[in-house]
Amino acid sequence: MKNDSRLRKYVPSLLLFLLFEAVAVTLWLMKDNLFYLLNFSYIGGCLALGTALFAAGKRYARHFAQLAVGSYMLLYLGVISRENMQIEGFWYYLFLGTFEAATIHYAVAKIFGPLLFGRGWCGYACWTAMVLDFLPYKRPQKPRREKLGVLRYVMFALSLALVSGLFLMKVAHLEQIMFWLFLAGNALYYLAGIALAFAFKDNRAFCKYLCPVAVFLKPMSYFSLLRVHCDESKCVHCGKCLRDCPMDVEVNREARKRKNGTECILCYECTKVCPTKALH
């Protein structure tokens, strides 16, 4: 029985790996391009290993996954391969009517994938959060400012308007422009993210208030299969889970599992600090 219980905690990691392998093989066969097999196998393998190490109690397991996947996507896919994997890249390929690069990435990680793993992208693979999570305010020092969340929708609309405008004006050398937008956009994200972290004393302030990608992630995350649950019979309402949650999710009420679950990044910091093991 003990062995079964120990193995059960690795099931999500196995399912994650199998999902990415299914995507890898499907795209490889559909597009007759070995890159898709290697790309999604690498990403899925890193995420599965990172989550498995976390389940085994390894302290820096999530940071391993963040660095392995985030650095690969930022430096290799973005800088070396010159693919704009930001939200502007998604609009670009979508307007071209091409199911490539950013459109595939968004479909898998940010539009349909959240049905399984919610906003796990934000916790384990985002190259912006990869840097922000190393800043000094792991625990938010101030309450979340709910009204500022509207800014992410403004950013979302601006990114759509920018790429739409470039297409409507039929700007020349648009592919090259998208590469420079990728570099400039990431620089602005890092600058804004670091500035907000110190201003609000919260590493994840950018994720809560400005990141436009959350607009894609939140709807499907509402139905996520993977989520943190609270056994209210064990909960002593000590508040440690909320104090340690980087996203200010009120996880200690079972009623929150749908609404507030759209902000949960599955970092499981709450489960580590729960004194009665009420969270799982």
Regions found by a protein language model. Name each.
Residues E254-C267:
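Short linker/helix segments within small regulatory modules
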Residues M1-N252, T262, K272, K277-H280:
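Non-ligating segments of multi-cofactor redox enzymes
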